[in-house]
């Protein structure tokens, strides 16, 4: 997650306010400091209404990490090098401890694409995948760009949605608005340079 608030102080205050009904297990400050907010054995309220594969409401079986970032509403910024170094260290520890599969390293927008954009298109998913955290494709960007403007058939478009479902995205009862948000969620993770919600050959 990113915090999506104007300041780090406000984010910490909200995450420790019982009335807000939102929390996380770990908080990573802009300077890279890691704060344990909720012990791992306890459920934190970070995922909210969420779905991935066959799981619904992922609070009960996930570990939530919040990273300081103003987000799309208040001036979305690149994550600091110190934040990413701390995130890599923390995530590697959690992967080893709980034997977490790479395909289950997720962003908030993966599990709640209808209402969330975080961690967003500036989150370094490719860099993390190189460090064996999460997944990334192996197709050269140059080759992908060449086919971006080619016409795509309805059959191919429908197959793309089916493949998203196979990965883990929840694709039932999609209307035009939900479909747009779903595709944008995928693009924010795997094609960060162009997030337009359009299904194309790339």
Can you say where each PLM-predicted feature lies in the sequence?
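Active-site-adjacent loop/helix surface patches within enzyme catalytic domains
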Residues: 1-103
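Basic/polar, cationic surfaces and motifs that engage anionic cell-wall
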Residues: 76-170, 181, 185-188
């Amino acid at each position: 997650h990113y915090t999506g608030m104007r300041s780090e102080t406000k984010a910490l205050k909200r995450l420790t306010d019982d009335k807000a009904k939102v929390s996380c297990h770990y908080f990573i400050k802009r300077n890279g400091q890691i704060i344990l907010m909720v012990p791992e054995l306890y459920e934190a309220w970070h995922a909210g209404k969420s779905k991935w594969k066959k799981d619904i409401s992922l609070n009960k079986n996930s570990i939530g990490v919040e990273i300081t970032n103003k987000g799309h509403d208040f001036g979305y910024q690149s994550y600091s090098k110190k934040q990413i170094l701390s995130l890599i260290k923390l995530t590697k520890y959690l992967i080893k401890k709980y034997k977490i599969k790479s395909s289950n390293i997720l962003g908030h927008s993966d599990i709640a694409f209808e209402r969330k954009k975080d961690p967003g298109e500036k989150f370094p998913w490719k860099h993390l995948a190189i460090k064996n955290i999460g997944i990334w494709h192996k197709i050269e960007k140059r080759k992908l760009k060449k086919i971006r403007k080619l016409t795509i058939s309805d059959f191919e478009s429908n197959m793309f949605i089916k493949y998203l479902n196979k990965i883990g995205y929840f694709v039932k009862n999609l209307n035009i608005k939900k479909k747009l948000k779903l595709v944008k969620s995928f693009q924010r993770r795997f094609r960060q340079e162009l997030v337009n919600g359009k299904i194309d050959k790339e």
